[in-house]
Amino acid sequence: MTPIFFNQQYPTLVDICARWQLVYDANATFELRFESDTLSLHKRDEPKLDGIVVDFVTGAVAHRRKFGGGRGQSIAKAVGLKQGVMPSVVDGTAGLGRDAFVLASLGCTVTMVERHPVVAALLEDGLRRAYQDAEIGDWMRERMRLFHGSSLEALSKLAQEVDVVYLDPMYPHRDKSALVKKEMRVFQSLVGADLDADGLLAPALALATKRVVVKRPDYAEDLDGVKPNTVIETKKNRFDVYVKAAMK
């Protein structure tokens, strides 16, 4: 059971916390709120910080879907997306679902795996609103779903054939931008660093039929010390690609 603070007078919050086995704690560091049909996470000792929400419909994520470069984006190249090839993807470290959403918006079917119940609750709420949206709801229902569980367990238990496993383990950020600082400070204090991240590569390679893609900061070492087959570099990050078979 994960401790959380929330207004116990709100039936919606009571239901959400019961569903995700979140237990009320008056002294908890984090608070969940449900306002304007949106679930948000707040760090109680930093009240000036905005709440963290999962929003696939508006804001930066929607802007990237419309103007972000389509299949020319590095992440699309990394997973092998090309004309006539729409890989199925397991995102083993879903976080706020942004990379998963980019891949789904480009045509991939994506299963997001998230082990932390608070983050999973935020993802589910974001999916609920996206599924209801007139513009993106139809394809969101077809292409994006959530699997709550330990990444390691989930990757080994997912029975269906998966083309690509995508991993973006939590890594200490040097970036000083306000957004990264805010979200990473809140996120890392909520979920902690991915101390078992190296243990993800082997089950990911066992599950993926075509390739495993690992997103890393440009200064990070190779995951589990294993050299990738190819590397796609961006301004601040890189995608390490471990190829098992050709994309067809």
Swiss-Prot record:
Gene Ontology MF terms: rRNA (guanine-N2-)-methyltransferase activity
InterPro entries named in the record: 16SrRNA_methylTrfase_J, SAM-dependent_MTases_sf
Main location (coarse class): cytoplasm
Reactions catalysed, as given in the entry: guanosine(1516) in 16S rRNA + S-adenosyl-L-methionine = N(2)-methylguanosine(1516) in 16S rRNA + S-adenosyl-L-homocysteine + H(+)
GO cellular component assignments: cytoplasm
Major enzyme class: transferase
Annotated localization: Cytoplasm
Alphabetical list of Pfam families matching this protein: SAM_MT
Superkingdom as given in the UniProt entry: Bacteria
Keyword line: Cytoplasm, Methyltransferase, rRNA processing, S-adenosyl-L-methionine, Transferase
Protein EC: 2.1.1.242
Ligand binding (S-adenosyl-L-methionine): R98, D99, E114, R115, S150, S151, D168
Family: Belongs to the methyltransferase superfamily. RsmJ family.
Described function: Specifically methylates the guanosine in position 1516 of 16S rRNA.
Protein name: Ribosomal RNA small subunit methyltransferase J
Organism annotation: Shewanella baltica (strain OS195)
Gene: rsmJ
